[in-house]
Amino acid sequence: MKPVTLVGHRHDCPLHGAGVVETGSADYTFNGKPVARVGDRVSCGALIVSGSTNYLIGGKAVARQGDETDHGGVLTEGDADWLLE
C-alpha cells in the first residue's frame, strides 16, 4: 500500500531536480488538496505516468508515492491517511 500524492507534494526529477506536483483533480480533494492522477503535471513540466490500477478519479489512475513521471522522476511524498495498492 502506498500513500496517495496530492498537489503540493514533492517529486524528484533526474533532469531538473526536486519540485512539487502542480495539477490534480478539479473535482476531488483529500485533506484540502486536489488528488494527483496520471496525466497531471509536476513543476519541471513532466507528466505523471503511473498510478493505482485499482482506483480512478475522473477516469484517471490516482498517483501515489513512488509512482513515476515521463522524465524518469519519482513522486517522493504522499498522504499516509489514504493508502492504495
Regions picked out by a protein language model, each given a short descriptive name:
Residues 2-85:
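Intrinsically disordered, low-complexity proline/glycine-rich segments
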